[in-house]
């Protein structure tokens, strides 16, 4: 199937491998995929070890899908030789709130790190069982030293622009395009939104004529404590 897809398209092709299954990754590299997704949505092959990316020539991505998402798992997993880096993601639901929560938590933790002195950085790295040089590099850069993509729940051009303005380097969109009313138009509009994410006039024009957004989401209403604001939640 992967070979058929590569023969049919000119865009880069990404394929999934199970966590820790380096032989699957070797096979994917040998048949010519452009990226390997060491995917947390598949059943892991190895619960204790991730694939050593230094043994491969192609870039990898991995998921940063954790409660209150924060850098520690990114240090322990995302920097094990990832050329492309971690992505902030949740399974596709059409609800962008999970991706927003994750990237805000990650960026908030990095802001705290930037205010630490060297001794505090050393203690922090030890506390989270991460390599000191990677933690210090993050402090100096003011960001993760790998590219950071948003994925999961991005269903509109405005969603994509939101994730970019929150600090992501790019956006992965699958179901948000292919489960929409007009996939081709929506994909084109989302690409434009990522490119021109700080231009509200262009973003506004891109929201029209896209057909129905991703459907099939069951939501419930939740009132924020102490406010009149009501949120939709995925059940």
UniProtKB/Swiss-Prot annotation:
**What pathway, per the record?**
Cofactor biosynthesis; pyridoxal 5'-phosphate biosynthesis
Q: Which reaction does it catalyse?
A: aldehydo-D-ribose 5-phosphate + D-glyceraldehyde 3-phosphate + L-glutamine = pyridoxal 5'-phosphate + L-glutamate + phosphate + 3 H2O + H(+)
Q: Where does D-ribose 5-phosphate bind?
A: 153, 174-175
Arranged from A to Z, the UniProt key words for this protein are: Lyase, Pyridoxal phosphate, Schiff base
Q: Which residues of the sequence carry a binding annotation for D-glyceraldehyde 3-phosphate?
A: 104
Query: Which N-terminal residues, if any, form the signal peptide?
Result: none
Active site positions, chain numbering:
16
In the record, biological process GO terms are:
amino acid metabolic process; pyridoxal phosphate biosynthetic process; pyridoxine biosynthetic process
Q: What does this protein do?
A: Catalyzes the formation of pyridoxal 5'-phosphate from ribose 5-phosphate (RBP), glyceraldehyde 3-phosphate (G3P) and ammonia. The ammonia is provided by PDX2. Can also use ribulose 5-phosphate and dihydroxyacetone phosphate as substrates, resulting from enzyme-catalyzed isomerization of RBP and G3P, respectively. Also plays an indirect role in resistance to singlet oxygen-generating photosensitizers.
Protein name, per record = Probable pyridoxal 5'-phosphate synthase subunit PDX1
- Species source reads Stellaria longipes
Q: What is the lineage of its organism?
A: Eukaryota, Viridiplantae, Streptophyta, Embryophyta, Tracheophyta
